[in-house]
Design a protein with these regions (language model features):
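Extended non-catalytic domains of envelope/secretory-pathway proteins
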Residues: 112-113, 122-128, 132-134
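Residues on the solvent-exposed faces and adjacent turns
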Residues: 8, 15, 33, 103-107, ...
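Extracellular loop and loop/strand-boundary signature of outer-membrane beta-barrel proteins
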Residues: 29, 116-120
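Membrane-embedded beta-strands that build the outer-membrane beta-barrel scaffold
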Residues: 42-44, 57, 85, 99-101, ...
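Short beta-strands and strand-coil junctions in structured, solvent-facing domains, enriched
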Residues: 11-14, 82, 108, 154-156, ...
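Elongated, acidic membrane-bridging lipid-handling scaffolds
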Residues: 1-97
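Beta-strand-rich interaction surfaces with strong enrichment in secreted/lumenal proteins
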Residues: 74, 119-121, 133, 145
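Repeat-solenoid scaffold signature
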Residues: 136-172
Length: 173
């Protein structure tokens, strides 16, 4: 797969036997993976929740995912947020990610509305930035060395988000 071009593609991820799914549509991308032991690079854009998302991905060696972690660099660019992640990803024994995240949004309320599928809201929060070391394991995301800045507030600390239904639980200090 030296040079692959995807035009107007769709990816459906089906989560369970009930057919719960997530769709990524209108995918336009260029990717390269000469061999499974070579780096995977992919760059392009797609639609998610009616918003164009640009991406740039580098994965050190996909073959490593069979038995150990692989290095990953991912940048996402939307109207709602610009984010970069640099770290490691594992697929076994369970999916996990650990590394450094930086993100910047011109409108935190619009970002939250986009993530939750709700119409944009007006609020005084305004823009925001976040940087943190994160560890994402099944059922939990841990933020350490976290720093955030909003229009009228800033802070630092750590947090753990427990991903349980019906709502996630946040503990922070």
């Amino acid at each position: 797969l030296n040079d692959v071009e995807i035009e107007d593609g769709t990816v459906r991820i089906i989560y369970d036997e009930n057919g719960a799914e997530r769709r990524f549509e209108k995918i336009n991308a260029n990717l390269s993976l000469p061999h499974l032991v070579d780096p995977l690079t992919a760059k392009g854009d797609f639609d998610w929740k009616n918003t164009r998302v640009g991406f740039d991905l580098k994965l050190s060696t996909p073959a490593d995912l069979e038995s150990r972690s692989a290095r990953i660099e991912l940048a996402l660019d939307t109207e709602a947020i610009d984010a970069k992640f640099d770290g490691n990803v594992m697929s076994k024994p369970a999916f996990s990610v650990e590394g450094d995240l930086t993100a910047k949004s011109q409108s935190v309320p619009s970002l939250i509305a986009w993530m939750r599928k709700e119409p944009p809201t007006e609020a005084a929060v305004g823009s925001g930035e976040l940087s943190s070391h994160i560890a994402w394991q099944p059922g939990e995301i841990t933020f350490t060395q976290a720093r955030f800045a909003l229009t009228h507030a800033s802070g630092q600390g750590q947090a753990v988000v427990t991903l349980k239904s019906p709502r996630p639980h946040l503990r922070a200090a």
